[in-house]
Structure formats: structure tokens, C-alpha cells
Amino acid sequence: MNDPLPHSKPHYHLIDGLRGVAAIIVVIYHLGEGFCTSPADLWLANHGYLAVQFFFILSGFVLGYSYDDRWTGMTSRVFLRRRIIRLQPMVAAGVVLGVAAYFMQGSVTWSGEHISPIWVVLAGISTFFMIPAWVGSPLEIRGNAEMFPVNGPLWSLFFEYLGSLAYCLAIRRLSTRALACLTAVAAVGVGGFAIGNATGYYHLGVGWSLSGVIPWGGAICMLFCFSAGFLMARLFNRLPRLEVRGAFWWCAAVIVILLSMPYVDYGGCPWLNGIYETICVVFVFPLLVWIAASGKTTDSVTTFACNFSGDISYPLYAVHYPSLYLFYAWVWANNLTWGEAWPVAAALVAGNILLAWLLLKFYDAPLRKWLSRKGKSGR
């Protein structure tokens, strides 16, 4: 979800690779949602939603690294235009696929209520412009309180824009000490939200809806993750690197394990899940980013894995969910078990990865290149 790094600076290939690993886990996590009734009984990549917090930390780090020393001669308008060019083409693709999937489902809410096509189209338009659907409004076309019911995961792009705006207007102006204080305060907020059981499940699966405390939890997590990423970018050349042999594979394995961990409720103590998620977000994820930024690819296999997974990470995240809406409808209509549905689920993972690659090569990359040239010529 980040701008390409300046050619004059080294590229963090391992960070790109880890973003792709996390994106694939998000797809698997969303597949598992079709077979659970709550966050506590989801058994397939139970903590996959924490990948969004990992993405936010990555975004903060790469944006800080890319732009902290480049504001001389660059305006906020230029920065925000670059962010829009980076993010909006795949938002548009996700909206088109989401609207198409909704029509394929018969234009009905999950409870079976028919929705007029005009509201489906309006929901798509509002999603494109990152205007959330209020709970109970006609734009909330699925009846599931999603912020963006055309394509649910696009809620994180809403917070990505907020984080970019906060960086552009305020955070970049903070001293390193003030930024460290902001990060620490936000970390306490993250821990308080998770361990204090704000959601009812002692978890950080927040931000996807405007219902109750969910958007506030998303804002707190975004504030910490972006601030932590910005802070690490400032400190990276001042503090020791953590060079680990085979860093990409070790970090990828840790991410898979952390995001696949079952709901932590040992001895009937669900607050342990809040502690677990706080540790992951506040301590382990920043450490993994630091290790990845410290390392380099040293062989062709690792280089290919990082380049490919990094390339498809954002397109995959942005466009995979519409097909999962159809998957859910099929599973629930036929009362299928995972044992019966897994071949289709596996095909969806492979198909969405292929779709992400095709969209990147023949739509996203060419369009962004054209928009960037047009933006420069229009200055």
C-alpha cells in the first residue's frame, strides 16, 4: 500500500515480501469466517485480522523512510496526490468487482431483503470516494454493519488515507521525542482496548464498521501503527541493525504462526487473548519490520518470493473479498462443512492470486504510471 521508494534509496525487498505473506493469510482468514459464529471459534488463521495492523506499521515505516527528508520543494498536495495515485486504482477495481458480486448474489442482504439496484450503485460510488456507510442507512446494503459493504476490507484503506493525512499535516512535523511519546500513548490505548475488552472478545478485530466502539478501536490501532512505523524510520539509521541470516523466511514463519494462533482462552481466561494481541501489535510486529528492513535477499529464490509476493500484496488485498461473498452465500445456502468446501476455497486462493497479478500487470501498474506522468505534466 506504499509508494515506490525513491531510486536513490535502497529498496526493502524483505518488507515487500512480508506484506505479501500477510495478505495471503488475510485471504485464508476470510475464508474461515464462513465457518464460524464469533472471533472465538474461528479456527482457520484465527488472528488473521491482525495483518492489517502489520500493514499499517509497514506503511508508516516506508512512508517515513521515503518522505521524511523530501519535503523541501514538495507540497502536501503533491504527497496526497501520490497517495491517491498509489491507492485509488485498486480501490476502483475492488468496487467494480464488489458491485458485480452483489448483483450476482441477487441484490439481497444477508437476511434476504431485496435491495434496489440504485442503492447498490450508490454504495459503490460512496465506497470509491471512501465515504463509509452508517449502520442502518440505505447504503449499508448487506445488513451486516460493514463500513464498506460493497467490499468489506476496503475499510483499512479508509484508515490508510487517514494515516497518510495525519502524517502529511501533523505527524511529520513532530520532533522525534514527541513522536515517541505519541507512539507510547497510542500503545497504551491499543493495550487498553484489547485487554479492557472493548469489543466483547478481548481482540483487535476492529475498524471495519461504524458500530459502537469498532471505529474508535480502528483509529487507535492506526494511530499507534503508523506512529510506530514513522518512529522506526527516523531511528533506523541511528540504532543497530538486526541482521538475521535467512531473515525473510524466519520473519515469514513468525507471521504465519502468530496470525494462525487459535483464540487464546486458556483456563477460561479470554483476557489472555487481549494480552496476546497487544504483544503482537506493540512489540513483535515492529521487531519483525526492523529485522526485515535490516536484511537483504541473498539468493534468487528469496528474491523471487519477495518480489512476487510484494507485487501482488495490495491488489490481492483489495480485490479478493467480492469472490468470498459469493463463497459465503454458496456455503450457507447449501449448509456445507469445511471438508466439503475446501477444494473451492483453495481454488479461490489461487484464483485471487492470479487475478491480483493480472490486475497489477495490465491495469494497476500501467494506470499509475500514466497518472504519474499526467500529474507531472500538469504542474
Task: Name each model feature, range by range.
Residues 83, 87-95, 161, 187, ...:
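Alpha-helical transmembrane spans of integral membrane proteins, capturing the lipid-embedded, hydrophobic core
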Residues 20-26, 59, 83, 87-92, ...:
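Conserved beta-strand->loop/alpha-helix structural units within folded catalytic cores of enzymes
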